[in-house]
Amino acid sequence: MTMCSGARLALLVYGIIMHSSVYSSPAAAGLRFPGIRPEEEAYGEDGNPLPDFDGSEPPGAGSPASAPRAAAAWYRPAGRRDVAHGILNEAYRKVLDQLSAGKHLQSLVARGVGGSLGGGAGDDAEPLSKRHSDGIFTDSYSRYRKQMAVKKYLAAVLGKRYKQRVKNKGRRIAYL
């Protein structure tokens, strides 16, 4: 995997956490809250419903009647979950699109497709990849050099000397 910035990594971790929390119930995740149920009623140890003393207290005030509301605040209704899931999916898709577009651009540049990114012929920057015609010349020249090295090696191995003579006109002729 390529190197990611901190923001992308944080978004990925946030997405994984939100995905797992949205699609799993506390019981499925292995979390058990004894005595707290997400319904509007609170139940005692014996299973009988407890009376609602005051419905105007904020959640977490310490009364048994506020415990179900506090628990219900952690478990959002399906409509809110869908909205949060949609927002997260949209942000996650944007990040993935940017990553895939960057990879696609890098592959195009590596292949030499798309011309110069600088926009002008006067750029002094080194090219990211060699031109096709240079590649053909380099390949044929390196093939020629390999053939000559093989001929020279075979001549030395077979006992013949590899000589070069200069004729009267100054040309060099190689003998095997």
From Swiss-Prot:
One GO cellular component term: neuron projection
Key words, A-Z: Amidation, Cleavage on pair of basic residues, Hormone, Neurogenesis, Secreted, Signal
Impact noted for substituting residue 157 to A: Strongly reduced affinity for ADCYAP1R1
UniProt effect for mutating residue 151 to E: Strongly reduced affinity for ADCYAP1R1
Residues recorded with modification Leucine amide: 158
Listed InterPro entries: Glucagon_GIP_secretin_VIP, VIP/GHRH-like
UniProt biased composition (Low complexity): 56-68
Signal sequence bounds: 1-24
Identification of the protein by name: Pituitary adenylate cyclase-activating polypeptide
Upper taxonomic lineage: Eukaryota, Metazoa, Chordata, Craniata, Vertebrata
